[in-house]
A protein has these predicted regions:
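Acidic/glycine-rich beta-solenoid
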Residues: 1-233
Length: 233
């Protein structure tokens, strides 16, 4: 194990200069195993983890508190199958679960639960012949069947470069109803997005993240010579 220490001085006019220190500890494989933060002589552990004998992340402790501990599980292929903790739990299924079995590492279904929630939420995934996602079908409970399709997403087409040409998204329409919030058509110039049109006009409700179409012109997005986005109408 070796350690790297980074110092910062925090000067401010009329104030006492304070010293801030980050201490990084590494294991035998040169992976970060612990990060400690010291400010004004007070030290806390930001990150403390264990990789285990198979070199996979098994546990992660945040802010030095067992309350913020996360544990990770894997299958025999070393694919991540679960994250468990007091604040977040997630399960990933490949050739098991309620989705269509996948044996190539693609996820067939997933479930998760946040904090003290009692509701288990999840998605089932389907893929095309090139193993690109076509449908992410939402549901609740372990069977991913209750309140089906409330937040589903469907890719309606890809171009020859593998870029998405169409996307349908479902979400909350009112306090009691759910439905289609986006029906997007994406136009590209090569691999650069140039225009997005939405066939559905739905105002955001609650945490609804419906697409907002700011303009309907051919060149809604523009880029510089390096491909960085410079305009979004």
């Amino acid at each position: 194990m070796h350690v790297r220490i980074v110092f910062y001085l925090l000067p401010a006019s009329g104030k006492t200069t304070r010293e801030e220190v980050y201490t990084y500890s590494y294991d035998y494989a040169d992976r970060v195993s612990k990060v400690e933060h010291t400010l004004g002589g007070s030290k806390i552990t930001l990150y403390d983890c264990d990789y285990g004998k198979f070199r996979r992340l098994y546990t992660k402790l945040l802010h030095g508190s067992a309350t913020n501990k996360q544990s990770y599980t894997y299958n025999v292929c070393s694919w991540l199958t679960g994250i468990s903790g007091t604040r977040f739990t997630q399960n990933l299924y490949y050739n098991t679960g309620v989705g269509t079995a996948k044996y190539n590492g693609s996820i067939s279904s997933m479930t998760w639960k946040s904090g003290n929630e009692s509701t288990v939420r999840g998605y089932k995934f389907t893929y095309d012949g090139l193993d690109r996602v076509l449908n992410a079908t939402y549901g609740e409970t372990a069977s991913i069947s209750t309140n089906a399709n409330r937040f589903s997403e469907n890719v309606t087409g890809y171009d020859k470069n593998g870029n998405i040409k169409g996307l349908q998204r479902y979400g909350q329409l009112s306090s009691t109803s759910y439905g289609l919030i986006d029906n997007l058509t994406l136009t590209l110039n090569g691999n650069q997005l140039s225009c997005v049109e939405d066939a559905v006009s739905t105002a955001a409700y609650g945490t609804n993240t419906a697409f907002v179409n700011g303009a309907s012109v051919a060149g809604e997005y523009a880029y510089d010579a390096n491909g960085n986005l410079t305009k979004d109408l």
